[in-house]
């Protein structure tokens, strides 16, 4: 039987970060990936609105031969979130 797409995605993410996918039951964590220092939650959807934004930024960045990075913040919250494609992470 073929692996569910979300399980395969969790395995890819785990491998990328050097962790192991957690089964639903019997693990010490509720994270999707067991890792020594990171709490990794994986979300696979048909479409994420933030990725639609990232696609638009990527098109403009390519025209300038630059690496696309999206920074997100919420009013009144300190700091910000950084969205970078896994293929581009080593370029930063």
Language model feature labels by segment:
Residues 1-92:
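Catalytic phosphate/metal-binding cores of nucleic-acid and nucleotide-processing enzymes, i.e., regions
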